[in-house]
Amino acid sequence: MEDGELIKYFKSQMKGDPNMASAVAAIQTLLEFLKRDKGETIQGLRAHLTKAIETLCAVDSSVAVSSGGELFLRFISLTSLEYSDYSKCKKIMIERGELFLSRISLSRTKIASLCHAFIKDGARILTHAYSRVVLRVLEEAVAAKKRFSVYITESQPDLSGKKMAKALCHLNVPVTVVLDAAVGYIMEKVDLVIVGAEGVVENGGIINKIGTNQMAVCAKAQNKPFYVVAESFKFVRLFPLNQQDVPDKFKYKADTLKSVQAGQDLKEEHPWVDYTSPSLITLLFTDLGVLTPSAVSDELIKLYL
């Protein structure tokens, strides 16, 4: 499977299902790559998969694609030492890949069943940008006949908050779109904050759409619970202590990074994500359970070992 074919397959997966997370599309693409690979050794197969992950990261520079690809590779590679026969080993790797994919496809449902219990009747919720997991949680709350209203930031520069507002209107949920700059003003009106995450880092902090950090700071200042909902395939081996520690490959879009390689100055560009420290987060709802930020490192070690 050539690079061009790999990218085309990845983009077709994304286009075919708008609700599919980019990491899930990447894992489906890697599974298809695994099935079509013509290699004859396990070492060669691993090298080809690693190169395929790098190719996908060059197309979509989000944290989730990087962490999802690495976790997929680790999960299927656990069998490589068990069988000496290559064809048998590859067959088991494909089976494990399909098992991994089926597990992560249930992630949002598990998270929604855990988190919606924290939404009380009459709650006023603040959220940020467009998150498929947050939307799934709110769908579950609607199905449970809970009455609540949502404030959502417009989320510049792509106005993804308006996309979220439109989705919530279809659920007949009262929605108010607010300016990104109005987070501090609106915070006193809300009961809780729920956001998604592009990546969950080793210390229990998160990397998410730009503006998440300021929302967490305001929530902490006004003693409002700040909840994060994220699938476990977004757990990434990264330990940032501040904004500068987040790698540029995650901060900026892939197209922006290519233009920088061509000589353009990165100082003129706005980052797409920021880092929120664990001290600002109340709880994380994942398919592994409800975690405190301090418990994330233990779960991350289990995933990557």
UniProtKB/Swiss-Prot annotation:
Subcellular location: Cytoplasm, Cytosol
Residue list for modification N6-acetyllysine: K35
Subunit note: Component of the translation initiation factor 2B (eIF2B) complex which is a heterodecamer of two sets of five different subunits: alpha, beta, gamma, delta and epsilon. Subunits alpha, beta and delta comprise a regulatory subcomplex and subunits epsilon and gamma comprise a catalytic subcomplex. Within the complex, the hexameric regulatory complex resides at the center, with the two heterodimeric catalytic subcomplexes bound on opposite sides.
Family of the protein in this entry: Belongs to the eIF-2B alpha/beta/delta subunits family.
Activity regulation: Activated by the chemical integrated stress response (ISR) inhibitor ISRIB which stimulates guanine nucleotide exchange factor activity for both phosphorylated and unphosphorylated eIF2.
SUPFAM superfamilies: NagB/RpiA/CoA transferase-like
Gene name in the database record: Eif2b1
Annotated keywords: Acetylation, Cytoplasm, Initiation factor, Protein biosynthesis
GO molecular function: GDP binding; GTP binding; guanyl-nucleotide exchange factor activity; identical protein binding; translation initiation factor activity
A GO biological-process term: cytoplasmic translational initiation
A GO CC term attached to the entry: cytosol
Function: Acts as a component of the translation initiation factor 2B (eIF2B) complex, which catalyzes the exchange of GDP for GTP on eukaryotic initiation factor 2 (eIF2) gamma subunit. Its guanine nucleotide exchange factor activity is repressed when bound to eIF2 complex phosphorylated on the alpha subunit, thereby limiting the amount of methionyl-initiator methionine tRNA available to the ribosome and consequently global translation is repressed.
Name recorded for this polypeptide: Translation initiation factor eIF2B subunit alpha
InterPro entries recorded: eIF2B_alpha/beta/delta (IPR051501), elF-2B_alpha_N (IPR042528), IF-2B-related (IPR000649), IF_2B-like_C (IPR042529), NagB/RpiA_transferase-like (IPR037171)
